[in-house]
């Protein structure tokens, strides 16, 4: 099914999909968009990379179009700042021919004051991580009284990361809520709990992952000791002449320590873990 067949969607939104290079809808988009346009609660299971942002973005924008930028009409919750930023950018791209639409993205690791100014300037859509959204609500920078639509993206990951109470608290604040949609790669017990508590006759969408041939990846196991691990790792990188290497550690402390040790051996190293600020991550 092509996007141009969505007769209930504003031409400006369809024009944006064309400008973004989209013609044919993915399975999740074809199934979810009509349900959300009709205002159904929904649990959608679909693999990452299947176009879920467009699947919920088009209905959100369709409902928000025509409203002035003020108190938000829709909230999209994301488990991480990086995903929140990507969602906000995708929604902004979908709204490129709707100049009245404002999307504000709020997340931890960045200054509250700048985000508060953006919220107070007004918007129709807020994309947020749960903790930072609650921060702004407690500081009276965010009016949730007019939110009719809430979407939990990567709901399983978000709830498994410990945001269960925050998510419930946020939903409880939405007195004008008309629909709750959850998009998730898996349906965990926590996702089902949220659905049971807050959804009514929810539509269920299940998109199966495409079975692809296994990538050609060679796997090796090297037995070493704690004392020799650094030397063995360095020797492997040098002997194989690897140009790009990704190393995973089991703790944030070990990640930073290993990065420092490799840097002292004159490797060009970047370190990434959850305790880094947004500026350090960038």
Model-identified regions with their sequence ranges:
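Conserved helicase RecA-like core
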Residues: 2-282
């Amino acid at each position: 099914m092509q996007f141009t067949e969505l007769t209930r969607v504003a031409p400006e939104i369809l024009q944006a999909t064309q400008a973004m290079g989209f013609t044919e809808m993915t399975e999740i988009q074809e199934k979810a968009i009509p349900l959300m346009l009709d205002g159904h609660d929904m649990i959608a299971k679909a693999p990452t990379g299947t176009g879920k942002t467009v699947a919920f973005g088009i209905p959100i924008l369709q409902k928000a179009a025509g409203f002035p930028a003020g108190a938000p009409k829709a909230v999209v919750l994301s488990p991480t700042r990086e995903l929140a930023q990507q969602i906000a950018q995708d929604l902004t791209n979908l709204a490129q021919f709707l100049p009245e639409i404002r999307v504000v993205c709020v997340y931890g690791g960045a200054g509250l004051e700048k985000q508060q100014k953006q919220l107070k300037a007004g918007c129709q859509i807020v994309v947020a991580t749960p903790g930072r959204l609650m921060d702004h609500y407690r500081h009276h920078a965010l009016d949730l009284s007019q939110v009719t639509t809430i979407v939990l993206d990567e709901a399983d990951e978000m709830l498994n990361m410990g945001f269960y109470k925050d998510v419930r608290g946020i939903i409880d604040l939405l007195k004008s809520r008309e629909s709750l949609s959850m998009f998730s790669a898996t349906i965990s017990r926590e996702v089902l709990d949220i659905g049971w508590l807050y959804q009514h006759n929810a539509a269920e969408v299940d998109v199966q992952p495409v079975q692809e041939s296994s990538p050609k990846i060679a796997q090796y196991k090297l037995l070493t000791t704690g004392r020799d691990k650094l030397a063995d790792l360095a020797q492997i990188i040098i002997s194989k002449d690897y140009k790009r290497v990704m190393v995973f550690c089991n703790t944030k402390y070990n990640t930073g320590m290993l990065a420092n040790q490799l840097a002292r051996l004159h490797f060009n190293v970047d370190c990434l873990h959850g305790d880094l600020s947004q500026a350090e991550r960038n």
